[in-house]
Amino acid sequence: MPLGELEDEAMGKILLVGAEGPIRASLNEMMSAEDYKIEYAQSGFEAGIQAESLHPDAVVVDFAMGRNDALLIAANLRKNPEYAETVLIGLLSDEDNAAGFDRTIFNETFRKPFDGALLAERVRTLVGRKKQLV
């Protein structure tokens, strides 16, 4: 196995979808570049392309991109057996929180505003747990 593949397996891979600047900056600052590779997508189409190439351990979907788009991305990931074990985190506004929808599709949801350190810690914990099980 080439060394690059070993590094990829050891490194946590995170895909941020529709995330606003402050959230991106916060996660970049709090997640070690040696331990985590973070990629970004602004749309469902980009998310699909990035997911195919990155095979992320976690996908963080910001509902700021639109509730329907965010739910569609989450549903499509869950339908695909390749991403059955992918950790899925939703970032919700008060409006999204009040609007009823099935949250079981997500491993975790955060309501804005939230502490970026808490999000980073939960991502680390959930990705670490996933990697131990694989």
Residue spans of the language-model regions?
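Non-catalytic signal-transmission and effector/linker regions of two-component phosphorelay proteins
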Residues: 1-20, 115-134
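Acidic phosphotransfer microenvironment of two-component signaling modules
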Residues: 21, 42-46, 117
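Two-component/phosphorelay signaling modules centered on CheY-like receiver
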Residues: 21-39
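Acidic, metal-coordinating helix/loop segments flanking the phosphotransfer/catalytic sites
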Residues: 40-58
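Hydrophobic alpha-helical motif in two-component signaling modules
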Residues: 51, 60, 73-74, 83
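His-Asp phosphorelay/catalytic-motif detector in bacterial-type signaling
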Residues: 55-57, 81-88
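Conserved phosphotransfer microenvironments
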Residues: 61-77
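Alpha4 helix (beta4-alpha4-beta5 surface) of REC/receiver domains from two-component response regulators
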Residues: 72, 92-112, 117, 121
